[in-house]
């Protein structure tokens, strides 16, 4: 989020305080906050929405600017809006003359949604009113007005959606931002009339189409029951299970807990933030590669009962692989070897410290691999690799190397480009994707190892930790994806919704059920997705419907349709020494946090039933 404020430092402090309050772990405080939230939800009115623009449907290519004009809770509004789209904020405080407003107008030229936030005490000077009219004539505009409704009369002749709520509170600002993007639906009508365009009883009904953001009490979860998560994770960090952790909990379509712990490194100064970006490791399998296969299955572009060799010609020359079906690979029953140490094939001439046409593949800072290394070395080694007994469950990264090749052969598109176009951009995901250093400053990306002992022998930050994926250029079917917790919550809420999110259908419900249900006769697995194996993984309380996956770097995503929940756990357990640090796994930190989440839900249900 970019902020253009006269008092930027103060605003940032206020934003942090507002965020902390929104997710307070105190039942008494949150009960009062919930009462305020409910009041705001019941009073927010959507006006001038005959065209149905609200809630915003199309997130792809959306560039949002918030223009705050005397708005009292701008930091709260911005923090929530940024959950849905990257937002740049401007403030009109101190701007008075026409020339200054014209300069601000010029700064808005690259944005295609301008949100004006206005309070009842905002002064509509002639220069400001002219500015508002000029912007509304050239851009899609949404007005948000809090407090006294008299300023609605100033907007009477502007045909643009408006959101009004009478109580000028932080909760109202949060709800207004969520109404814009569909995290909350609106049903209220104006209690009084203000002008011919805003008559008493005016108001449009809008629907909830995306995740909302609230307190645990909003879904009958007692915040006090979640307080132990802090203790668990802080103890884990102290035991060097991982230096950096982010946990997100969502239930009933509401994110009710999102918190960051620790620092990027044990001895560093970079404090972990809730929106930090982590290496997904094997969570790539179920957030990129398997969904790509699901899309092709939906479109009948592939048949999972067909052999892989139908789609990949070179597999026809591999006797032990030519008859393997796609579904066998997805179930890890193809007989493939678990993994291949490709780095053991490296020769000094394969690597360079400088980039060139001969060495284009960047695997770390100052480390490049020669051109065509995957096609000339890695892929032939994969095809010739010895296997295991077909039909037996052997978890294998090679399965997803194969699935990536299937996707690219059928779509004629690179896997990273395909999932960006089909899922990540339409969903409004801001951080999810491969090759994050091409898009983000590395300070936003949590490092995975201080000294990669496999082959790079240096800090790995923003480059995929997995050696095979790194050597393949950072885009592979088993690893290479990076994401943050909020993005993952959106993606897995879409799956929990049976393939629907934001008013758009990404999968047929039957496809989601087919891939996430148990499909194996010899294991607990679905097609690509992991499922409950025992009480240790993913925890003691999850239902038989639950599905998800874990990642080697310390990542964890689980969805439980029976409890209507999403659980995201991100960490860098491989830091500082990949291959020797497995604390998160050894102390079962990820399942323990999930168990605490389930207990809080069950306790909440008991209280509701008792009442």
Could you say what each language-model-derived stretch is?
Residues 218-280, 301-303, 537, 578-579:
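Short, conserved catalytic-motif segment at the N-terminal edge
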Residues 319-545:
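Short, surface-exposed loop or secondary-structure junction motifs
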Residues 12-13, 24, 79, 107, ...:
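Coil residues (strongly favoring Ser/Thr
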Residues 1-27:
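Bacterial Sec-dependent N-terminal signal peptides
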Residues 239-246, 268-328, 386-399, 476-479:
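Short active-site loop at a secondary-structure junction
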Residues 24-222:
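Preference for extracellular/luminal or secreted protein segments
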Residues 27-28, 32-34, 54, 191-199, ...:
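Short, gly/Ser/Thr-rich active-site loops of penicillin-recognizing serine hydrolases
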Residues 546, 553-568:
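Short, surface-exposed beta-strand/loop micro-motifs that present aromatic residues
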């Amino acid at each position: 989020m970019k902020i253009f404020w006269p008092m930027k430092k103060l605003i940032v402090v206020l934003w942090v305080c507002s965020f902390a309050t929104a997710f307070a772990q105190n039942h008494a405080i949150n009960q009062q906050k919930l009462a305020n939230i409910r009041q705001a939800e019941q009073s927010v009115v959507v006006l001038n929405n005959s065209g149905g623009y609200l809630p915003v449907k199309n997130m792809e290519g959306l560039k949002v600017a918030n223009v705050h004009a005397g708005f009292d809770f701008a930091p709260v509004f911005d923090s929530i809006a940024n959950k849905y789209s990257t937002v740049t904020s401007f403030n009109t405080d101190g701007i008075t003359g026409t020339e200054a407003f014209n300069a601000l107008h010029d700064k808005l030229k690259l944005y295609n949604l301008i949100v004006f936030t206005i309070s009842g005490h905002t002064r509509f000077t002639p220069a400001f009113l002219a500015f508002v009219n000029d912007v509304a004539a050239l851009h899609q505009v949404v007005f948000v007005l809090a407090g006294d409704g008299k300023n609605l009369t100033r907007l009477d002749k502007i045909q643009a959606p408006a959101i009004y709520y009478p109580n000028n509170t932080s909760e109202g600002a949060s709800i207004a931002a969520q109404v814009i993007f569909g995290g909350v639906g609106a049903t209220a009508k104006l209690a009084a009339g203000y002008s011919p365009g805003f008559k008493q009883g005016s108001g449009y009904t809008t629907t909830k189409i995306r995740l909302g953001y609230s307190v645990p009490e909003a879904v009958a979860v007692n915040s006090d029951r979640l307080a132990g998560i802090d203790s668990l994770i802080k103890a884990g960090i102290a035991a060097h299970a991982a230096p950096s952790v982010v946990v997100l909990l969502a239930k009933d379509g509401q994110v009710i807990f999102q918190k960051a712990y620790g620092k990027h490194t044990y001895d560093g100064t970079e404090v972990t933030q809730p929106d930090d970006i982590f290496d997904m490791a094997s969570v790539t399998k179920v957030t990129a590669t398997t969904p790509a296969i699901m899309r092709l299955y939906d479109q009948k572009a592939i048949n999972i009962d067909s052999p892989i060799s139908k789609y990949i010609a070179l597999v026809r020359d591999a006797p032990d692989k030519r008859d393997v079906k796609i579904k066998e690979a997805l179930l890890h029953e193809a007989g493939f070897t678990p993994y291949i140490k490709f780095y053991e094939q490296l020769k000094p001439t394969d690597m360079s410290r400088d980039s060139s046409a001969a060495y284009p593949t960047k695997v770390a800072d100052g480390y490049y691999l020669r051109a065509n290394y995957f096609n000339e070395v890695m892929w032939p080694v994969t095809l010739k690799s010895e296997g295991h007994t077909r039909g037996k469950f052997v978890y294998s990264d090679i399965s997803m190397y194969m699935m990536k090749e299937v996707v690219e052969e059928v779509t004629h598109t690179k896997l990273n480009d395909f999932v960006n176009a089909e899922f990540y951009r339409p969903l409004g995901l801001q951080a999810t994707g491969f090759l994050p250093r091409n898009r983000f400053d590395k300070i936003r990306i949590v490092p995975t190892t201080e000294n990669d002992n496999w082959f790079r022998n240096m800090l790995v930050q923003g480059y995929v930790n997995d050696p095979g994926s790194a050597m393949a250029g950072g885009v592979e079917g088993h690893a290479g994806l990076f994401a943050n917790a909020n993005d993952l919550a959106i993606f897995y809420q879409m799956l929990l919704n049976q393939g629907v999110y934001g008013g758009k259908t990404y999968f047929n419900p039957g496809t989601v059920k087919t891939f996430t249900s148990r499909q194996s006769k010899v294991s607990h697995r679905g097609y690509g997705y992991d499922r409950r194996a025992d009480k240790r993984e993913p925890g003691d309380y999850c239902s038989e419907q639950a599905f998800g996956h874990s990642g080697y770097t310390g990542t964890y995503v689980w969805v439980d349709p029976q409890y209507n929940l999403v659980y995201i756990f991100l960490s860098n357990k491989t830091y500082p020494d990949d291959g020797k640090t497995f604390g998160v796994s050894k102390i079962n930190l990820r399942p323990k946090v999930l168990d605490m989440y389930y207990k809080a839900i069950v306790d909440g249900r008991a209280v509701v039933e008792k009442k």
